[in-house]
């Protein structure tokens, strides 16, 4: 544009100097303009082209967004399951399921570290303390924590080897039998599905700590929209949100631990506390039943710790990022649960009135502990952290349920439409289905919504223990299948540090936990045998059996209880196809680690 103006000015000054008339000047100006157009282009056309290009870019952007919701053609992925057996179809379909691989190592690390921190820890630990006392809470968290440690390590070994859609849900079908995959998968999806509306209600009730004038249904709607929008951004949206929310939750727990140690040692209105509440009123409440009653609360607190494996199929390089996330399990269990349980037991007696009679955030031992220490602003901070935790768990609920439902659908265990994957790698129908269940959160306006959700949760009350136990069984069958087919453990990319011993002991611990829960459900604490209480706590047990039998009958597979070890597919779904090359690379990596100093080897074992 400046070029054209300069040319015209030069021509006009030249014409004036030589005595040209106005027509000649105009003609010269037009010629100059034409030459300028020829040399530098017509600026008006440039402007118009720029406008058109901008409009086209905007149209293309919205078109790309629109097209991203169209289905991913599985035939383009090379999937033809028409001539395959149910087991073969399950294995191949889950291996080639086109979920987007957009999670990075930092996402996986924070999902592993802080993804399971939620209302189970911040509020549920209070119920455990009231029923069992500080000693029972510590024992219960240690026992369930050990069981989870074996599960996550076993699952890490399997997920690094086979980063397939659905993770452990697909492993149930591959290493056990598709009916087990359908049963455990639906129970697992149901637990997340029911968690979403309950977390929405928890968020609305938590907000009422500050404002009781706004109808809680309004807050349910707000949080529902936020969670749904996050998940419609795909796995990258889920990963980024969990990354930042987990950082906040981790900082909050670490801050509480530091503050709790200070209050215990005498910083606060109460002076030195130490372990006096372990002596008066005592370490245990209700004896062995009190210890057993902690298991369900502990399972609720630990729930979601396995999500890191579910995310493996959507991770760019699970071979590198997943082992590091799995190894951190020991530290997060110890720091965020065991250490927190010890501090809570030191700061809050199980006879505390707020603990026994409070509701919501008021019954949180975190809030009670700092309030008794004379720090008045911290309850508001913890309340905000609980809101963040609720959003995080709601976000994970949609993610966990939708991925599980989509995996079941692609395996042929649910209607095909549930496995709809759009071009953005989102299981769209499964996300919308899970989000629709979240609308049950509007039951917050009903007077007896607590009873409704008690029965909802009874569907999946023990399902976490069944799922975790089945993961350990799958790990054992994976190792047994390697031996039965003459394969070496040298081809295992990441070996569970606890090995098969961990899986065996984990199964034993989980069986004892389930037996204890059935006992406490039949004969509740402080009351005679109660049939209704039993069904509230153990409905998932007969439901699991009926569901498994239904799958066996529908698929007419009663002639096969297990997939034979010799018939288990040990290759489909690997990202490293050349087994011999893989074994060579792994041997070199292990040799490098062996050559390092002892301190480094210890570091690599734990991190």
From Swiss-Prot:
Keywords associated with the record: Amino-acid transport, Cell membrane, Glycoprotein, Membrane, Transmembrane, Transmembrane helix, Transport
Glycan-linked positions: 357, 395
Any single GO CC term annotated in Swiss-Prot or TrEMBL for this entry: extracellular vesicle
Induction: Expression is under control of the CSY1 amino-acid sensor. Expression is also regulated by HAP43, GCN2, GCN4 and SSN6. Induced during biofilm development.
InterPro entries on file: AA-permease/SLC12A_dom (IPR004841), Amino_acid_permease_CS (IPR004840), Amino_acid_permease_fungi (IPR004762), APC_YAT (IPR050524)
Compartments in which it is found: Cell membrane
GO annotation terms (biological process): amino acid transmembrane transport; S-adenosyl-L-methionine transport
Membrane topology: Multi-pass membrane protein
Compositionally biased spans, kind Basic and acidic residues: 1-10
Positions of region (Disordered): 1-45
Transmembrane segments: 110-130, 132-152, 184-204, 214-234, 243-263, 291-311, 330-350, 373-393, 427-447, 452-472, 506-526, 531-551
Matches recorded under Pfam families: AA_permease
Keyword RNA-binding: no
Keyword Cell membrane: yes
MF term (GO), any: amino acid transmembrane transporter activity
Main location (coarse class): membrane
Disulfide pairings: none
Composition bias, Polar residues: 11-30
Superkingdom, taxonomy of origin: Eukaryota
Family in the record: Belongs to the amino acid-polyamine-organocation (APC) superfamily. YAT (TC 2.A.3.10) family.
Function of the protein: Amino-acid permease involved in S-adenosylmethionine (SAM) transport and required for SAM-induced morphogenesis. GAP4 is also able to transport arginine and thialysine, and thus probably also lysine.
UniProt-recorded name of the protein: S-adenosylmethionine permease GAP4
Gene source species: Candida albicans (strain SC5314 / ATCC MYA-2876) (Yeast)
């Amino acid at each position: 544009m400046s070029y054209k103006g300069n040319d015209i000015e030069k021509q006009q000054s030249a014409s004036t100097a030589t005595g040209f008339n106005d027509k000649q000047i105009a003609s010269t100006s037009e010629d100059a303009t034409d030459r300028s157009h020829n040399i530098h282009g017509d600026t008006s056309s440039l402007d118009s082209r720029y406008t058109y290009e901008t409009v086209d870019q905007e149209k293309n952007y919205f078109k790309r967004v629109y097209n991203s919701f169209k289905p991913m053609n599985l035939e383009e992925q090379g999937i033809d399951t028409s001539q395959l057996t149910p087991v073969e179809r399950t294995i191949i379909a889950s291996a080639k399921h086109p979920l987007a691989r957009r999670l990075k190592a930092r996402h996986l690390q924070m999902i592993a570290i802080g993804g399971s921190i939620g209302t189970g820890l911040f509020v549920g630990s209070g119920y455990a303390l009231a029923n069992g006392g500080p000693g029972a809470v510590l024992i219960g968290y240690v026992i369930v924590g050990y069981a989870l440690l074996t599960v996550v390590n076993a699952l890490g070994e399997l997920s690094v080897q086979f980063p397939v859609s659905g993770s452990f849900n697909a492993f149930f079908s591959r290493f056990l039998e598709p009916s087990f995959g359908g049963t455990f998968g639906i129970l697992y999806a149901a637990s997340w599905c029911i968690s979403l509306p309950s977390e929405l209600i928890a968020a609305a009730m938590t907000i009422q700590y500050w404002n009781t004038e706004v109808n809680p249904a309004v807050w349910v709607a707000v949080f529902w929209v936020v969670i749904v929008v996050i998940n419609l951004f795909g796995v990258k949206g889920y990963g980024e949100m969990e990354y930042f929310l987990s950082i906040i939750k981790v900082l909050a727990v670490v801050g509480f631990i530091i503050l709790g140690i200070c209050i215990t040692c005498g910083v606060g209105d109460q002076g030195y506390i130490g372990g006096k509440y372990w002596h008066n009123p005592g370490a245990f409440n209700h004896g062995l039943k009190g210890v057993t009653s902690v298991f369900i609360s502990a399972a609720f607190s630990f729930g979601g710790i396995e999500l890191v494996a579910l995310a493996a199929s959507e991770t760019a390089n699970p071979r590198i990022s997943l082992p590091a996330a799995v190894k951190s399990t020991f530290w997060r269990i110890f720091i965020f649960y065991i250490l927190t349980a010890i501090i809570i037991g030191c700061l809050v007696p199980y006879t505390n009135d707020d603990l026994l009679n409070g509701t919501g955030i008021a019954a949180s031992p975190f809030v009670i502990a700092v309030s008794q220490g004379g720090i008045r602003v911290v309850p508001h901070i913890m309340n905000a952290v609980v809101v963040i935790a609720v959003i995080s768990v709601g976000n994970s609920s949609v993610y966990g349920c939708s991925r599980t439902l989509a995996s079941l659908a692609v395996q042929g265990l649910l209607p095909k439409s549930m496995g709809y994957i759009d071009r953005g790698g989102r299981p769209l129908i499964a996300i919308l289905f899970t989000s629709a269940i979240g609308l049950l959160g509007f039951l917050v306006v009903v007077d007896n919504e607590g009873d409704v959700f008690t029965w909802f949760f009874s569907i999946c009350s023990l399902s976490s223990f069944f799922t975790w136990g089945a993961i350990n069984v799958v790990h054992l069958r994976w190792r047994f299948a390697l031996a039965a087919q003459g394969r070496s453990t040298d081809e295992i990319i990441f070996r569970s540090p606890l090995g098969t011993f961990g899986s065996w002991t984990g199964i034993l611990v989980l069986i004892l936990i389930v037996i204890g829960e059935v006992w406490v459900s039949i004969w509740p604490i402080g009351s005679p045998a109660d049939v209704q209480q039993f069904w509230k706590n153990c409905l998932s047990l007969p439901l699991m059996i009926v569901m498994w039998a239904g799958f066996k009958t529908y698929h007419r597979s009663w002639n096969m209880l297990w997939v034979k070890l010799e018939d288990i597919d040990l290759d489909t779904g690997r990202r490293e196809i050349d087994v011999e090359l893989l074994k060579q690379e792994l041997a070199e990596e292990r040799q490098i680690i062996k050559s390092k100093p002892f301190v480094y080897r210890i570091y690599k074992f734990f991190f």
